[in-house]
A protein has these predicted regions:
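N-terminal leader/auxiliary helical segments
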Residues: 1-86, 93-323
């Protein structure tokens, strides 16, 4: 993660920066939530009781064959909804790989979000802060964080995901499970708004007995952001020192998202060769922002089609300079 609204906001700002007119906003936002959509699928069931363990697959997608999955999405795009889902997904990848190391840093011992559940508390506080900045209201409605794609758009997105998941991870996931994942993601998110704190208090009690601190309350908005966030920090994964805190990193994420979107559009239009889009996107772990043996692993599923089979046919992706 970050949380949903942060991802959707980052993707929208990136699209605006390159004058791309979003025509399927729910599909675009669904892509901006990336693999996180899978984490709510039948979460109330034990993994072995689920129709498919999508939460485990979502975790795998953050760490394994990340670049191969992005290339598979790019290769199988055919429709407008699929174009915009993929553009949103590229933004999710950009934001996660830039912001996650900072999230890990502020959750280290001595950091403002050290302790049980700190990761979630920071991310929902950032979500609440950005939503308040944009709308004047810090409570984040589900339809702002994860609007639900419907009808033909949803069918086209699930088809794209089926192809990419099969090709990259060898995972055969039904269209019904994928469609339900988007539905559950939106519905579960609706449980985590608590304007007057009643649900937060209830979830706090539940956490005492199930799941541990932050399992539920780490997703509840509104939440105030700590005032002592560092601008200078050390990446726990690499030991590298950085200057620039959460809001500077958000601006970087918008720029990187815009770069990835531009690259994808140019690739589909035949301007950017396959080797260049592979180099541009890389294959980084979503959590550390670095390339690892696992993140750079090749696709585990059936062989991909030749490069000349790639690219959307209709409608073509377009930009609108009037936006």
């Amino acid at each position: 993660m970050p949380e949903g609204y942060t991802h959707v906001r980052t993707a929208r700002k990136a699209a605006h920066a390159i004058h791309y007119k979003v025509r399927c906003p729910e599909a675009f936002a669904a892509g901006a939530n990336g693999p996180d959509v899978f984490f709510s699928f039948e979460i109330w069931k034990r993994p072995r009781s689920r129709r498919f363990d999508l939460p485990a697959l979502g975790s795998r997608m953050h760490e394994e064959a990340t670049g191969a999955f992005l290339q598979s999405l790019l290769r199988h795009v055919k429709t407008g909804a699929q174009v915009e889902y993929t553009l949103g997904f590229l933004s999710h990848y950009a934001a996660d790989t830039l912001l996650h190391p900072y999230v890990a840093a502020v959750c280290e011992p001595g950091g403002p979000y050290a302790g049980k559940g700190g990761h979630g508390y920071f991310e929902i506080a950032l979500d609440s802060t950005l939503h308040a900045e944009d709308t004047g209201v810090s409570q984040v409605p589900a339809d702002d964080a994860c609007p639900l794609p419907k009808g033909e758009d949803l069918a086209e997105i699930t088809l794209l995901l089926q192809q990419a998941l099969r090709e990259t991870y060898g995972a055969e996931v039904s269209a019904e499970c994928l469609a339900d994942a988007f539905y559950y993601f939106n519905r579960v998110r609706r449980l985590f708004t608590s304007r007057h704190g009643l649900r937060r208090g209830l979830f706090y009690v539940v956490e005492t007995f199930f799941g541990g601190r932050g399992f539920l309350t780490g997703h509840v908005s509104p939440r105030a952001l700590a005032l002592n966030l560092p601008d200078d920090w050390t990446d726990p994964a690499t030991g590298q020192q950085h200057h620039g805190g959460a809001f500077a990193l958000l601006k970087q994420a918008e720029r990187l998202s815009a770069l990835y979107m531009t690259g994808a559009l140019q690739h589909w239009m035949g301007v950017l060769p396959q080797t260049d889009i592979v180099k541009l996107l890389g294959s980084r772990d979503y959590g550390t922002g670095t390339e690892t043996e696992r993140s750079t692993a090749p696709a585990a599923g059936p062989a991909a089609p030749p490069p000349d089979a790639a690219g959307p046919t209709e409608p073509q992706p377009s930009t609108d300079k009037g936006e």
